[in-house]
Regions:
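Short N-proximal segments of mature Sec-exported proteins
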Residues: 34-89
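Generic hydrophobic alpha-helical segments
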Residues: 11, 53-54, 143
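Cleaved targeting-peptide boundary
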Residues: 18-26
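Domain-scale activation on soluble regions of proteins
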Residues: 25-31, 116
């Protein structure tokens, strides 16, 4: 039991202290659909970005915030499945870790977007975050298309 708690402590320490946002520019749609690790990374980042946008705009633009929230929640279970596969752990275990990772990344995105907003009067202008959002939009569109095709078979 002590060993298990120690491993969890080490994992959370790495997650909370060592994480910085890197642009998603090195990822491709092909990688997303063919590489489980890339898929997990992209899902985690896109869900976090959508969640950060939801938090930042929910007062001024509640309908738009609701749309971003729905997109994040649609992708969320697939992120957990992907995390479970890449870490070879149960869905329940993956869900706990994934939630923590997404929460931490969401906070990093919020901080970055606020800094950029103060500097450029825009959350996205002159920042990699706008490029990440465009990439996440393409991923989400493609992902939804694949899911709807699988459901129609």
């Amino acid at each position: 039991m002590k060993k298990y708690i120690f491993i969890i402590f080490i994992f959370f320490s790495e997650v909370t202290h060592g994480q910085t946002l890197q642009p998603l520019e090195n990822n491709t749609l092909e990688d997303f659909f063919t590489d489980e690790k890339a898929s997990h990374t992209v899902l985690e980042r896109c869900i976090s970005l959508y969640s950060a946008i939801t938090e930042l705009i929910k007062i001024k633009h509640p309908e738009l915030a609701s749309e971003f929230y729905q997109i994040a929640n649609t992708l969320y279970p697939y992120g957990i499945i992907s995390f479970s596969k890449t870490r070879n752990i149960s869905y329940e275990e993956a869900e706990k870790f994934f939630f923590t990772n997404v929460n931490n990344l969401t906070n990093l995105y919020i901080d970055e977007m606020k800094k950029n907003g103060e500097k450029n009067k825009s959350y996205f202008k002159m920042s990699f975050i706008g490029d990440d959002l465009r990439f996440c939009h393409e991923v989400t569109k493609s992902f939804n298309l694949v899911i709807s095709e699988l459901n129609s078979e």
